[in-house]
Amino acid sequence: MAKDAGLIEANGELKVFIDQNLSPGKGVVSLVAVHPSTVNSLGKQLLPKTFGQSNVNITQQVVIGTPQRPAAPNTIVVGSPHTPNTHFVSQNQPSDPSPWSAGKRNRKGEKNGKGLRHFSMKVCEKVQRKGTTSYNEVADELVAEFSAADSHILPSESAYDQKNIRRRVYDALNVLMAMNIISKEKKEIKWIGLPTNSAQECQSLEVERQRRLERIKQKQSQLQELILQQIAFKNLVQRNRQVEQQASRPPPPNSVIHLPFIIVNTSKKTVIDCSISNDKFEYLFNFDNTFEIHDDIEVLKRMGMACGLESGSCSPEDLRVARSLVPKALEPYVTEMAQGSLGGVFVASAVSTSNGTRLSASDLANGADGALATSSSGSQYSGSRVETPVSCVGEDDEDDEDFNENEEED
């Protein structure tokens, strides 16, 4: 294979040298460049093998050499930017450090992979995984991780790296706080979340809005139920006082049911299997037919102690009485309940889990059992029934209207 090389003379002409004797496997191309002003006179100059001899006097030249191609596979050519020497290195063996590279330069190159961006990502992952953490905890974990990875570093360099890691962690935490990804209160760091676009943020806010509306509805329902309980209890207290004043004596012990209580009623033909625990706090009932469970609040409502607010049939007189039984701050709620402007207050009896539970025959066929306690566990608001009054039953016509004759009470 023929190779060409050129020489620029003082007059600007390009002189071409051709060597036809170069073999294809050992071809060498050399380019010799000289400054035109440095050429004084013709003389003998020893040039590379490619050019042979020439009568050219060259005071300054730069030779760029391309060595012969490597015959062995998986080899690469390694050259120095400072010297024209080149050598071959096999790719299967780890290459030695370059002779012109300084240790400080290598160290700087290694640290380029551990910059603020790198540590920000690591710190972000740590805080996100922990949820709540501190600066020292994150820094200690990262120092331990990188120290284990760089076990070959000298102790002096390791101390420097630990200080650098802690400084980077501190900077990364400040960046994440500025981006509102994390929050810091004293020494406690909490994860907030990665920034999102407008569409995602709008969707997230809509979900949060619906969740809070559901919570508001639940709180309203609880407030309305508590108002009904207070009205029913105070109405019961006034009724019992009137009965005692008319009879001029307290009611007989066998005619009193203490609060709280649970009533289980079913047909007379129903076969009931009842098991009672030794401490008499748990009762296990098995029924072969449908039955109903009512708590004390449901019974008081059916007795009319809630002034008809639970069913929306509150008369103006009942509304006046109900408003007088609650604190002044709750009177507007009572008015709204009487008008039906607050939704979710009217609950059917023997269906709501807070007011009662009804089990069908199919539930009993599947082996459904009911565990009852004397602490009125069927009511959702049994905690507000401390030191409640007693109800006098047995001589009132209202009790006969509540339960049919073909039902029995337990």
Curated annotation (Swiss-Prot):
Residues 259-315 are annotated as: DCB2. Residues 113-195 bind DNA. Pfam families: DP, E2F_TDP. Keywords: Acetylation, Activator, Cell cycle, Cytoplasm, DNA-binding, Nucleus, Phosphoprotein, Transcription, Transcription regulation, Ubl conjugation. This is Transcription factor Dp-1. It is found in: Nucleus; Cytoplasm. Its main location: nucleus. The lineage of its organism: Eukaryota, Metazoa, Chordata, Craniata, Vertebrata. Residues 104-114 have a biased composition (Basic residues). Belongs to the E2F/DP family. The gene is TFDP1. The keyword GTP-binding does not apply. The modification Phosphoserine is found at S23. Residues 394-410 have a biased composition (Acidic residues). Component of the E2F:DP transcription factor complex. Forms heterodimers with E2F family members. The complex can interact with hypophosphorylated retinoblastoma protein RB1 and related proteins (RBL1 and RBL2) that inhibit the E2F transactivation domain. This repression involves recruitment of histone deacetylase (HDAC). During the cell cycle, from mid-to-late G1 phase, RB family members become phosphorylated, detach from the DRTF1/E2F complex to render E2F transcriptionally active. Ubiquitinated by the BCR(KBTBD5) complex, leading to its subsequent degradation. Phosphorylation by E2F1-bound cyclin A-CDK2, in the S phase, inhibits E2F-mediated DNA binding and transactivation. Residues 204-277 are annotated as: Dimerization. Residues 82-95 have a biased composition (Polar residues). Disulfide bonds: none annotated. Residues 105-127 are annotated as: Interaction with CEBPA. It comes from Bos taurus (Bovine).
